[in-house]
Structure formats: C-alpha cells, structure tokens
Amino acid sequence: MIKSADRNSVVAFYPEFASQTRLFTALSQPTFTKAPKKLFRELIFPAKVFIGVCMKTKAVRLYGVNDLRLEEFELPPIKDDEILAKVVSDSVCMSSHKLAMQGDAHKRVRAKLSENPVIIGHEFCGTLVEVGKKWQHQFKAGQKFAIQPALNKDGTLWAPGYSYAHIGGDATYIIIPAEVMELGCLLEYKADNFFMGSLSEPVSCVVGAFHAQYHTTAGSYEHRMGIVEGGSLALLAGVGPMGLTAIDYAIHNPRKPGFLVVTDIDDARLQRAESLLPPSEAAKHGVKLVYVNTRDIKDPAAKLKELNGGKLYDDVFVFAPVKPVVELGDSLCGKDGCLNFFAGPTDPSFSAMYNFYNVHYESHHVVGTSGGNTDDIKESLHMMAKGELNPVTMITHVGGLDQVADTVINLDKIPGGKKLIYTHKKLPLTALADFEAKGKTDPFFAELAKIVQKSDMLWSKEAEDYLLKHAPDL
C-alpha cells in the first residue's frame, strides 16, 4: 500500500525524473494499491501534488548569427499559470534557418541574443508533464499537445522557437508560458503518434495562405476571401515540402480550383511529387492537375498560359524567394488575379518588378502570410485526423537533437523535404531513402528500412515507435 505520492513512486513509472527533479515534495496523500500507469498518472501528476519541479533540459539555443549550441541547463519551477512539457518531435523549418542567418536582425527576436539566447524550433509535439493550477481545469498531465507558435500577442511577432528562453521545439523539456494558453494556442493532440503533430504547424501555414487569398467584384468594395472556386491556380516552385502540402490541400479542401499547374526546375522533385500526388488522385476530386518543369522552357509564361486554355490565372502562389519566379507569378495573373508570395526571404531588401499598370487596370493584388492562425491549425488537425490530408509526404529525413545545429545552419544545402527531429535521441540525420544502405552495417537502420518500405518509403507510426524504442538516447 502506497500512502503518499512520493518521489520514488513517481520515478518507478517515469524514470526520467530520477536524475532530473531537484524538488519533488508530495502534498496530497492519496491512498491506493498498485494501479495501472494511466491511473497512477491521474493520481500523481496534477500540479497540486508538487511544490515545484525543477527540471533539467537539453536544448539547442541561438546566441547570434549561426551560433547554435546544444546545452543542458535547469528550467525553473513552473508558476501557477505555466505548464511543464516534454517535447518528443520537432520538424525543422526553413524559417529557423532564416532566424539563424539573421540573428538579432530577425523580426521575431525580442532581445539581444548573446545575453538572452532562445530555444529554436517551432513545429513540435509532445506530452504535458505538470500543469499549473490556473490551467488544471483545461489540461492534464499526460495529454499529448501541439502548438500554434504564431501567438500574435498584443500585435507583436513573438513566438516560441524565436523569442523565448524556455520554450522551443528543439529541447527535451520546456515551460509553456501563460500567453500560449491565454491565446488558445496550446492544442490537445489526440492521435497515436507525434510526428503528425509536428507537421500540423507547417500545414496550417498553407491553410492560412489559401484563406488569405482574396478577390473582388467590380463596383463593390467587398473582398471575397479564398481562391476562386473552380478557377485556375498556379503553384510556382511548388514541389518542396510546403508545395507538396499546398498541392494536397488544393485537391482535398472544400474550396478547390478546377485547374492546378505545379512548376519546378528539378525533375527528381517533380517526379516524387507526381508519384505522391498523381493527376489521377486530383481528378477524383474534380481537379485537373499538371506538373511542368520550366527549366528549359524559353517562355514559361506563354507555356503555362497555353496549358490553361490560353487564359491567365486566378490565383498564383510563389514558393521560392527568387526574383524571376516572383516576376513570372506577376505575369501569370489574370483579371482580379491574386499573387501569394509564400516564401519569406532572408534579405530585407529583396524586391522584384511588379506591373502596376495591371494593379490599376486589371485589379491585380498581392498577399503574403507568415504562418497560420489558431483556426488554421485546428483545421489542419481536423483534416489530418479524418485522413483528408497526408502531410507525411513532407518528411524525407530523421535525426536526433544532436543534429539540429548543423541541420538548421545548412538547411538550404540539404536536399529533400522536412527534417524530423526526435529530441530525446542521438541519431545522425539520415534520409529515409538511405536507410537500406546504412542498414548493411547497422541493424537499427536495417529494421527501419524494412518498416518504411511497407509504407511506400514514407514515415509512419510503426517507424516512429521503433525509433523511440531503439534509437540511442541523447
């Protein structure tokens, strides 16, 4: 018979606490016999049980331009309006690369990094460990969570992964500050895996971009939000990880185009996109889908116009901050055409030619979004749960927390899509396509190769479960 929720009892169920808790004083006195882990967690883990838990964390922090350091340090005990959480997975975003390149100059940095380093990573998923008193009616320890990092607090750009000392995705444990909950940006995640939770944020960026599109009616000042239903849509440089998600969303969301053209200049990337999201799948949903390599086309604008029956496009998305691509997008917009500049540049002076004659006489307009909002991430989670979106196609590499610094700094030079990090693991960044070759000398990768081959070389719950169980701990 256990008469109190003492430290040793908790450690028996959660070994990670053995070396990481500094103060673990039980206040409540539940009396219970041996119970299943789930019941034990429910009895022990409410924050009222503890007078503060001081947790050690390992995290990658940014100190300045390309100055990323994997460090171990102690998190303070949480306050009544905070939540202690365990991060399991984080997917590396190009925005983190841009943050590392810009350092203090980045718009989301709120204080001098050399004196106030921030934990990087904002596409993360994990479990709640200790819930402050203020939030115990809404959240419980043991719940899985996803997060909407674009807080928009008081009109600022502050966000986890950019602006905070104790919260970011590339860490083992974090403290979720009050504003995340106050703004409705901590979301319960009910799936049986973690990697899809990490993908919900990048998916929400695409969802938000589609919702940000708008069109007008002559003689009216009302903006009709969204792409033109049944219209024509061009995704330029659109077969990277975010482009793949945009194709998936364009085909499967309720407001679809009638014609969708996707361009790139890399045959291998185009072939992978077409194999994952084939024109036959789009046709089932009433969308004509065409993939085009524009690399060797002398006049890509004319070719893309020809593919659209000689007409220009209602909606154009630009997925690369490249001047000729932006200008191609401008030239493709038809009457009342909306150009979405999706890819954020690192150069504050980045610019391109834009036809203002057409702004005046053809009602052209341009939009840009930086992340989705909370409704967008909820829509993403909902569509993913129903199987309407399958963003796992974005994942091409997996690795451990020890790989984050090099991966973020060199992200623009590493081919493929999303790099998925498991934060409690020490594991070289490895492409799924390379598992079989590495498996010739490493049984761990040999087994992973067999698992991903069963799912058409895509990451899966089975692969994640195997990695979490067998990959070396950090």
What is each model feature region?
Residues 37-54:
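Short, Lys/Arg-enriched N-terminal segments with co-localized hydrophobic residues
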Residues 76-91, 105-151, 168:
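Glycine-rich beta-strand-centered segment in the early N-terminal region that forms part
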Residues 149-230:
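NAD(P)H dinucleotide-binding glycine-rich loop of Rossmann-like/cofactor-binding domains
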Residues 217, 223, 297-305, 311, ...:
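C-terminal hydrophobic helical "lid"/dimerization subdomain
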Residues 230-231, 236, 247, 251-325, ...:
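Adenosine-nucleotide cofactor-binding segment
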Residues 241-242:
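Hydrophobic/small residue at the entry helix of a nucleotide-binding pocket
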Residues 315-320, 334-349:
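ADP-ribose/adenylate-binding Rossmann-like module
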Residues 343-362:
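Rossmann-fold NAD(P)-binding glycine/threonine-rich loop
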